[in-house]
Amino acid sequence: MCRIGSIKSKTPVPPSMALNLMLPQQEGHDNSGFAMVMQDLEGVFSHYKDKPLLSLACTPEGVQLVNDYMEERGFVQVAQWVPEVDKRPDLKINAMPRYVFRNYDYPEEYRTRSQKEREDLLLDTRLELRALLAEKQNGFVYSFWPDVLTLKEIGDPADIAVYFRLWNNDGRLTARNI
């Protein structure tokens, strides 16, 4: 069963605010997972709002495939956040080996192109990366867009929050829209 919550705030808030919306809805949860989209990011992403942010979960081989693909197409990585996960064995989560959130600079030839051309590039790139990782089950690309972070996982939402330390309000991961 799906539960939906949303927060839009004038000041940046941590994911725990959205997670608290789920607490009254826990009865009957089937452990099918948790998805979170954050927009208007602050914290570790505050200086990269105009840079496309790639959100992915993958194997080590998937990381290498993404690295090679992005380099071949002229994307330059400018920032990265890799969550420090809690790997307790009792957590009900179907975790991937790697979770990566990277900001990139556009390829040189796209830096002066129209907004529409850059948006088309990001959409096409996400779809190509998705197909590349799916080919040998090396992972999932959730989003590739400026100032948007997407995190998804299968399992108990409370355990997923513990795994990604989303209950910690350390200021590193905040947004105005969750």
Segments (PLM) and residue ranges:
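N-terminal segments that mediate ammonia production and transfer
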Residues: 1-178
